[in-house]
Amino acid sequence: GELIANTLSRLQVKLIRGAGNPDKLGIKEKGGKAALRSMIKILKGGNSVSFTADQPPGPGRLAGNGAIILAKLSGCPIVPVAATTSNRYEFTSWDKFTMHLPFGKGAVIWGDPIFVPSNATKEEIENKRNLLENSLNELTIKVNKVVEKK
C-alpha cells in the first residue's frame, strides 16, 4: 500500500487512507470509518473515488464489504474495473500486487454498474459482494487475454 500511496502522492492524486477490516487484522480501528465518511462526502459532491476491493491480510481477489457499504450509504453505483499491461512484475504478496512496467501493451476494461439499495439487508449485501467479486475476477481474466493477444 505504501508504494502506491507514495507514487500517487507524487502524481498529486488526493488520497484517503484507512484500513478496511481491523478485526480481520487483529488490530483496533485504523481510520476506516473516517475514510468511509470522507468518500461519501466526495461522492455526494459529484466526484468519483476508487480503491481495491480486497482487504489485507487477504487472501487476495476476494472482495470485502467496503465498496458495498459505500454504495449503500452514498447511493452511488460501483463500477468494477480491471487494468493490466503486458509488461509487468507480480509480487509474491498476499494480494499478488502487480507493478506495471513501461514499453508494453495496456488495457482497461469495466463491467456493468452494481447498485446497492439503501435498505439492503445483510443477505443482499453479501449477494452484491459476491457479484462484485465475480465481476472483478471475470474482468481480470478478460483484460489479461486482451494484452496477451498477438
In which residue ranges do the predicted regions lie?
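Hydrophobic, well-ordered secondary-structure segments
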Residues: 8, 19, 32-43, 66, ...
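Membrane-interfacial terminal anchoring regions of lipid-handling membrane enzymes
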Residues: 42-44, 126-150
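Catalytic-site beta-strand/loop segments enriched in glycine and acidic/polar residues
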Residues: 35-70, 74
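Catalytic core of membrane glycerolipid acyltransferases/transacylases, capturing the structured
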Residues: 1-29, 74
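Active-site and donor-binding regions of nucleotide-sugar-utilizing enzymes
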Residues: 22-24, 30-36, 86
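A cross-family acyltransferase "interaction/gating" segment
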Residues: 59-122
